Each structure stands twice: as structure tokens, then as C-alpha cells.
């Protein structure tokens, strides 16, 4: 199994990229997966008092690494692309348990275009979306400006994704990995123009 990691910004074309990649029979690119959280919390538990009382480093490494192996055990493709926007902020976890040479694919788009895409989607859908539900729980008024502020503030989907990506650069973790940015603009160009 060769693992790659899709950590694209929301509304930046990662679903389109996934659909394109899945046309190759040797690649499986899935939707958002729980693999990161499974590995992160397993690693966290193994650093706590009970595990450290009688440490078993090799067993601990196997426990955490097995999360990604087991999650994709139903797949036969040699290239597996796990999707989670948190990966850039936790490259150390990838290096420790998956590969010394992680490859991250990140679809990117201008933040204002991301927000505009969300707002368009919300209006087109016409139902109560996850942003509106969260805002109502916090007693916020549902306006497009408030939605944008909510998504761009800490805890918001756009801010969290951009912060995870920025963390990789702040911690200088991108120097020793393959970081593949994919621009939404280039991804959506008409095929005849991009060839």
C-alpha cells in the first residue's frame, strides 16, 4: 500500500480531483476519513500514564500504524489517498507511523472564492446546513456576512483548514515532504486548454 494524503481546502476542487483520480483503477481516493483522528487519539492515549507505566514502543507503533492499514483493508488498489484537512498540521504523525516521505495533495483556492462558493451552495440547497445549525446553536443571526465571519473565525471550517495548512509552513514541515498544491483554477480549466 502506498499512501498519499489529500488535505485540500474546502470548496477548492478536492471532490473533483477525487473523481478524476478514481478513474484510474490503481488509485482509490476516498471521501473525508476518520483515519487521522484514529491515529491521533491512539497516539495520544499511548503517551498517557497507564501506557507509559509499562511502555512497549514497538507494540505502540504497530497499534497506531494499524489504524490506517485496517481502515483501507477492504481496498485492493496499490495507491490509497486518505482525505483529511488536518494532515498538514500533523506531518510528524505521518512520518512517525506511515512513511518517512509523506506526499500531501492540497487543492487550493482564494479564500473569498471559497466563501462565495459556500454561500452559493447554501442558497441553492435551501435547507438548514451545518454552518447555519452551528450558528443558531450559538444564537447568531443568519446572514451571509455572519456566515462568512463564522467560517473564517477560529473553529470555522475555512479558518481551520487554512490554519492546518499554514501550520505545516510555520513549523517548516514542508521542507522534507512532497507537497503538491493543485489550484482550483487550473483544475477546472477546460480540458482542451490544459492539454
Predicted regions mapped to residue ranges:
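PAPS-dependent sulfotransferase catalytic core
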Residues: 1-75
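Short beta-strand segments
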Residues: 6-8, 80-83, 106-108, 179-182
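Histidine-centered beta-alpha loop that forms part of the nucleotide-sugar donor binding/catalytic region
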Residues: 32, 85, 109-110
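PAPS-dependent sulfotransferase catalytic domain
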Residues: 61-74, 116-187
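Glycine-rich phosphate-binding loop used to anchor ATP phosphates in small-molecule kinases
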Residues: 71-90
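A short acidic, amphipathic alpha-helical/loop segment
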Residues: 90-96
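Conserved phosphate-donor/acceptor-positioning beta-strand/loop module used by diverse small-molecule
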Residues: 98-118
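Single conserved hydrophobic/aromatic residue that forms the stacking wall/gate
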Residues: 186-195
Amino acid at each position: 500500500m502506498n499512501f498519499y494524503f489529500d488535505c485540500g481546502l474546502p470548496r477548492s476542487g478536492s471532490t473533483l480531483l477525487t473523481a478524476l483520480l478514481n478513474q484510474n483503477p490503481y488509485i482509490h481516493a476516498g471521501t473525508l476519513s476518520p483515519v487521522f483522528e484514529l491515529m491521533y487519539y491512539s497516539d495520544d492515549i499511548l503517551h498517557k500514564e497507564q501506557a507509559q507505566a509499562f511502555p512497549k514502543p514497538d507494540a505502540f507503533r504497530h497499534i497506531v500504524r494499524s489504524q490506517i492499514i485496517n481502515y483501507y483493508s477492504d481496498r485492493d488498489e496499490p495507491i490509497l489517498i486518505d482525505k483529511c484537512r488536518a494532515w498538514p498540521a500533523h506531518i510528524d504523525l505521518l512520518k512517525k507511523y506511515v512513511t518517512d516521505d509523506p506526499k500531501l495533495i492540497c487543492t487550493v483556492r482564494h479564500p473569498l472564492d471559497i466563501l462565495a462558493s459556500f454561500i452559493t451552495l447554501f442558497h441553492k440547497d435551501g435547507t438548514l446546513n451545518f454552518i447555519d445549525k452551528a450558528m443558531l446553536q450559538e444564537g447568531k443571526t443568519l446572514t451571509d456576512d455572519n456566515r462568512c465571519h463564522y467560517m473564517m473565525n477560529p473553529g470555522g471550517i475555512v479558518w481551520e483548514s487554512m490554519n492546518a495548512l499554514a501550520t505545516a509552513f510555520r513549523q517548516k514541515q514542508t521542507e522534507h515532504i512532497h507537497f503538491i498544491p493543485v489550484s482550483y483554477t487550473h483544475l477546472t480549466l477546460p480540458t482542451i486548454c490544459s492539454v
